[in-house]
Amino acid sequence: MKWIASLLLSTVCFFGYGQQQLSAVSDGINRVNNDLLTSWLNDIRPEGEDLSKVEGSPYFLDEWVYGKVVSVRGERYGDVRLKLNLYQKELMVQPLNSKDSFLMDDSKLLQFAFVGQDSTHTFVRVQKLEGQKPEPYLDFYQLLVSGNMNLLYQPIVEIREPPKTTMATAGGRGAGFYSREDNFYLYNGVSLEEIKGARKPLLKALGRYQKEVDRFISDNKLKPNKPEDLIKIVSFYNQLN
């Protein structure tokens, strides 16, 4: 996850939430209440598989980072540090000036952000609208570009065994965390469409202004399969709307 965490994104500030446009979070003013917590990590850790021997890191960022949280009811919370386990899909929270850690109840979360000095990494939950009723909230996605068309990235971490040849040359190295890095989506407030980085499918998914976007890609020699170029393309598309 280092590449996406260190990518210099067009930074959105923290959050207002519109039907189509997602944005990132205004100052949190309250401390997280107990309704948003599922367990006290120092006390009641849910039982699971032993990950102590798995190489690498399952976290979006390895260190605790100052963050903000927004609940599905629109409540905003600050004064916390956050840590996101991508393999177990768990958001951990630690109040400032405290060593106690808690698990967040993700069913009650709408958005959260890691707030750094140089950039803010925002995660959102989105809904697909079918007919008159919205579907249940989906998993969290990292918000890379905000606008009429939002560019989202779904970080997925898996555990994989190394190839036998690698195990032999690496002295029997064991399983490690592996990050899938091709999970990009376009979200317009109604539909969520996965994009694989190929030029023609991307233009079709964007819908409008295909000629203008195609010319922008050619003039700037961009490659839609590169995350930094994909961000530029979707940002340009939003300028046309």
Predicted feature residues:
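Bacterial Sec-dependent N-terminal signal peptides
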Residues: 1-24, 233
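Short hydrophobic/aromatic-rich motifs at helix boundaries and adjacent loops
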Residues: 5, 37-40, 184-187, 202-205
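Sec-dependent signal peptide cleavage junction
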Residues: 17-50
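Extracellular/luminal recognition modules and glycoprotein regions
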Residues: 40, 45-47, 54-65
